[in-house]
Amino acid sequence: MTTQAAEVAKRRTFAIISHPDAGKTTITEKLLLMGKAIAVAGTVKSRKSDRHATSDWMEMEKQRGISITTSVMQFPYREHMINLLDTPGHEDFSEDTYRTLTAVDSALMVLDGGKGVEPRTIALMEVCRLRDTPIVSFINKLDRDIRDPIELLDEIEAVLKIKAAPITWPIGCYKDFKGVYHLADDKIIVYVPGHGHERIETKIIDKLDSDEARAHLGDLYDNFVEQLELVQGACHTFDKDAFLKGEMTPVFFGTALGNFGVDQVLDCIVDWAPQPLSRATHERNVEPTEEKFSGFVFKIQANMDPKHRDRIAFMRICSGKYEKGMKMRHVRLGKDVKIADALTFFSSEREQLEEAYAGDIIGLHNHGTIQIGDTFSEGENFGFTGIPHFAPELFRRVRLKDPLKSKQLRQGLQELAEEGATQVFFPERNNDIILGAVGVLQFDVVASRLKEEYKVECAYEAINVWSARWIECDDEKKLKEFQDKAFENLSVDGGGHLTYLAPTRVNLSLMEERWPDIRFRATREHH
């Protein structure tokens, strides 16, 4: 095996998806602890004080205690290199989250054992399904009261349309939580409370049918054996092929806060989750073991460092090897650039990078030339596909408090739109500026960032827009005719694309009927 093939085989790149408050930030910290990445995992409760969770860093996040921006963390574990992408857990950030899911090879779904499958999880799973991403499931919070585990598995199957195969099974919960039983290995992994901040040797009892197991389970033993027979009769047995096709999810139980069960999840990702996979471009499929470098930008983030007013473009490497100082082609601009200062991410610590391989996420300093969806290669002119924009669902008109700052406002919005924080539309018929977002919180984020980073204060006004559709048409004459007739509702987005802003659902249906040659697109590939 070549060095490069060996490096690719070591990589596991995955994202965590969950509903807010299911324990995602805690599990992120515990995973880093597994990789000895943070000596002491700061509990999330200390957020209100000075010690903020390492993966939540922007000012507004510190106030609200939510991870708005996607952060990337790399750490070693069992001779593998783990790339963990933390996705925004808050209701509103599905566009950013969506694109993060385009950059991973598998995902870890975290469910709150007391609540089961929640709306945000459903939305994220739909995104994973678009690419048949393999999903590992972790049912969290067993140190509290949880719902019946069989019910939880049924719900995963019914609501998320994926087969659930339990790998471990909980023994009791809340005050009676004794640990989990590993179905295939016939062993009990004993829960010892109070070790949330440190790694401890796990105590294991071999064989459920043993005196030691009976002593540990006490009064719970007979009931547990009975329940287990039911589980083994009714539940799916794990099938790795079905998992890799995105049809089945292995399910683990534990408590992230108690640092229990997280290591089994990480072992599963190392043992079963795919190494970096091939990626589609407009021209051909690119294999991770190819010698020549290639990658795509899936996210741009401003001001990761309050000390530097910089923007960082996050790039997923798809093939080859990054070496410090190498030349690569920025395909959209047709320009060759020398990259000497790419970054690797260790939570909020940033380090200069010497080399990186397929599956790794690297950060490029962006001075306004890099956009989401950009492809970089070692000379070849192709573009990676599957990194869409989504039609926003909410719209506001922007009103400037100081009319003299309109230049700063436009610059700020242009940069925030390139970064994917919002979408901006300029109507053809007047000088309004309209913002589009997938969730309300995005508007707050944009206003607070305009104020902090661009010294511009703005207010929002309601506007009569139901949804946006990108316009495509092969017939120039028809397009011109459409533009004349639909002038009142046409805008140009931040990327210069013609967009129809429909005032109502009925209006959009009528327009689609009336103009069969015009394509009204709800998503737009980044070009």
Curated annotation (Swiss-Prot):
Gene3D superfamilies cross-referenced by the UniProt entry: P-loop containing nucleotide triphosphate hydrolases (3.40.50.300), Peptide chain release factor 3, domain III (3.30.70.3280)
Top-level division of the source organism's lineage: Bacteria
Pfam families the record matches: EF-G_D2 (PF22042), GTP_EFTU (PF00009), RF3_C (PF16658)
Membrane-crossing segments per the record: none
Entry binding sites for GTP: 18-25, 86-90, 140-143
Gene Ontology MF terms in the entry: GTP binding; GTPase activity; guanosine tetraphosphate binding; translation release factor activity, codon nonspecific; translation release factor activity, codon specific
GO biological process: one example: regulation of translational termination
Annotated ranges, domain tr-type G: 9-277
Segment forming the signal sequence: none
Entry GO terms, CC: cytosol
Subcellular location: Cytoplasm
Keywords: Cytoplasm, GTP-binding, Nucleotide-binding, Protein biosynthesis
Family: Belongs to the TRAFAC class translation factor GTPase superfamily. Classic translation factor GTPase family. PrfC subfamily.
Protein function: Increases the formation of ribosomal termination complexes and stimulates activities of RF-1 and RF-2. It binds guanine nucleotides and has strong preference for UGA stop codons. It may interact directly with the ribosome. The stimulation of RF-1 and RF-2 is significantly reduced by GTP and GDP, but not by GMP.
PANTHER family documented for this protein: PEPTIDE CHAIN RELEASE FACTOR RF3 (PTHR43556:SF2)
The protein, known as: Peptide chain release factor 3
